[in-house]
């Protein structure tokens, strides 16, 4: 991670000194070195195993069809509209009651 940050900061620093193709090549070399270092370290191998396991689990998921996703989306939109109307009505009642109480003169 530090290597990525150093590469990005170096890219900003060398913006005035070197042209874009040289900076792109330098950034590519820095990224390759960072990936190599990540692959040979203990944390890098754990991260790679985690990503492989995540990909395996994502393949096991039963994803909804387009029709199911559309129906679920419409249900969520409908419930949201009903809830917003309910809260608007409750808010209006509360505001009316408070206005009535604050306008009373004793």
From Swiss-Prot:
Q: Which parts pass through the membrane?
A: 20-40, 75-95
GO CC term, one of those recorded: plasma membrane
Query: Could you tell me the membrane topology recorded for this protein?
Result: Multi-pass membrane protein
Name the InterPro entries on file: SecE_bac, SecE_sf, Translocase_SecE/Sec61-g
The family database entries (NCBIfam families) matched by this protein are listed as: PRK05740.2-1, secE_bact
Quaternary state and interactors = Component of the Sec protein translocase complex. Heterotrimer consisting of SecY, SecE and SecG subunits. The heterotrimers can form oligomers, although 1 heterotrimer is thought to be able to translocate proteins. Interacts with the ribosome. Interacts with SecDF, and other proteins may be involved. Interacts with SecA.
Among HAMAP family, the record links this protein to: SecE
Name of the protein described by the UniProt record: Protein translocase subunit SecE
Q: Which organism is it from?
A: Haemophilus influenzae (strain ATCC 51907 / DSM 11121 / KW20 / Rd)
Name of the encoding gene: secE
């Amino acid at each position: 991670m530090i290597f990525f940050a150093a590469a990005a900061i170096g890219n900003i620093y060398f913006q005035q000194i070197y042209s874009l193709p040289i900076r792109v090549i330098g950034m590519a070399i820095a990224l390759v070195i960072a990936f190599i270092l990540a692959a040979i370290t203990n944390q890098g191998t754990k991260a790679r195993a985690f990503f492989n396991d995540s990909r395996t689990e994502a393949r096991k998921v039963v994803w909804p069809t387009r029709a199911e996703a559309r129906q679920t989306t419409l249900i969520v939109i409908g419930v949201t509209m009903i809830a917003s109307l309910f809260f608007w009505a409750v808010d209006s009642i509360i505001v009316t009651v408070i206005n009535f109480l604050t306008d009373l003169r004793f």
